[in-house]
C-alpha cells in the first residue's frame, strides 16, 4: 500500500518563472525555499530530518542574519530524527520562526515550541499534542531492561527541552506529558508552546518585525 504522503509529494505542482536567461521551473517547495520557507510535513523520520536540516544549513549559508520560517504539519515520529532537526535549529545563526498549520503532535509539538521566542505561531484551527516517548522492544530480558533505561533517559531529556521552551516547571511538564494531551491553539498558547495565534499574513509579519 502506498504511503499517502509519498503519493501527495509525487503530485507537487511546478512554478515557471521568467528570467534573463529564459524560463525556469521549480517545484513549489523549492520556490518557497527561495523565500526562506521550509515545510516539515508528515511523519518525522530520518530522510525527512536530513532534508529539513540540509535546508536550514543552506539558508544559513545564504544569509546568516535573515530569519527562516518553518511550517509544521506533522503527527510526530522518530525521536532521534526530531532531535536532529531540533539541534540544527538551535545550532544555526538565523532565527527560526515556527508555524503550525494542521497539527503538531509528539515531536512536531517539540519542534513547534523550539522556534525563536516570540516567533512561534499556530493558525486558529491547529491542533497540538504532547506526550512522553513510547517504544516496543523484544528480546532477552537484559536487552529489554537496557532499552527501558534508555527510553526513561530520553523522556527526561525531552521534558527538559519542553521546560526550556515553554517556561513550565518540570513537575508541570511531567504531569502533562504523562498521557496524550491534546490542545487547541488557545490552549497551546496558554501552555507556552506558541506565542501567538495567526489569522493573517500581516499578523505574522508584524510579530516577526517586532
Curated annotation (Swiss-Prot):
Locations listed in the record: Cytoplasm
EC number, UniProt record: 3.4.21.92
Gene Ontology molecular function: ATP-dependent peptidase activity; ATPase binding; serine-type endopeptidase activity
Assigned keywords, A-Z: Cytoplasm, Hydrolase, Protease, Serine protease
UniProt keyword Nucleotide-binding, yes or no: no
GO cellular component, one term: cytoplasm
Catalytic activity, as annotated: Hydrolysis of proteins to small peptides in the presence of ATP and magnesium. alpha-casein is the usual test substrate. In the absence of ATP, only oligopeptides shorter than five residues are hydrolyzed (such as succinyl-Leu-Tyr-|-NHMec, and Leu-Tyr-Leu-|-Tyr-Trp, in which cleavage of the -Tyr-|-Leu- and -Tyr-|-Trp bonds also occurs)
Superkingdom of origin organism: Bacteria
GO biological process: protein quality control for misfolded or incompletely synthesized proteins
InterPro entries attached to this UniProt entry: ClpP, ClpP/crotonase-like_dom_sf, ClpP/TepA, ClpP_His_AS, ClpP_Ser_AS
Main location class: cytoplasm
Record: active site: 106 (nucleophile), 131
HAMAP family: ClpP
Recorded family membership: Belongs to the peptidase S14 family.
SUBUNIT field: Fourteen ClpP subunits assemble into 2 heptameric rings which stack back to back to give a disk-like structure with a central cavity, resembling the structure of eukaryotic proteasomes.
Function according to Swiss-Prot or TrEMBL: Cleaves peptides in various proteins in a process that requires ATP hydrolysis. Has a chymotrypsin-like activity. Plays a major role in the degradation of misfolded proteins.
Entry protein name: ATP-dependent Clp protease proteolytic subunit 2
Organism: Agrobacterium fabrum (strain C58 / ATCC 33970)
Amino acid at each position: 500500500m502506498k504511503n499517502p504522503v509519498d503519493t501527495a509529494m509525487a503530485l507537487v505542482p511546478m512554478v515557471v518563472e521568467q528570467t534573463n536567461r529564459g524560463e525556469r521551473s521549480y517545484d513549489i517547495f523549492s520556490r518557497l525555499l527561495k523565500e526562506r520557507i521550509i515545510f516539515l510535513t508528515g511523519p518525522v523520520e530520518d530522510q525527512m530530518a536530513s532534508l529539513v536540516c540540509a535546508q536550514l544549513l543552506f539558508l544559513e549559508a545564504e544569509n546568516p542574519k535573515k530569519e527562516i520560517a518553518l511550517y509544521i504539519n506533522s503527527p510526530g515520529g522518530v525521536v532521534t530524527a526530531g532531535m536532529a532537526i531540533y539541534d540544527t535549529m538551535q545550532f544555526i545563526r538565523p532565527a527560526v520562526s515556527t508555524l503550525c498549520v494542521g497539527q503538531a503532535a509528539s515531536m512536531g509539538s517539540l519542534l513547534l515550541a523550539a522556534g525563536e521566542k516570540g516567533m512561534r505561531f499556530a493558525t486558529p484551527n491547529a491542533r497540538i499534542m504532547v506526550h512522553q516517548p513510547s517504544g516496543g522492544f523484544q528480546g532477552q530480558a537484559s536487552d529489554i531492561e537496557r532499552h527501558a533505561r534508555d527510553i526513561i533517559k530520553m523522556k527526561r531529556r525531552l521534558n527538559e527541552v519542553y521546560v526550556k521552551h515553554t517556561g513550565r516547571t518540570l513537575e508541570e511538564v511531567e504531569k502533562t506529558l504523562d498521557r496524550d494531551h491534546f490542545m487547541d491553539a488557545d490552549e497551546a498558547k496558554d501552555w507556552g508552546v506558541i506565542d501567538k495565534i495567526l489569522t493573517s499574513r500581516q499578523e505574522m509579519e508584524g510579530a516577526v518585525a517586532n
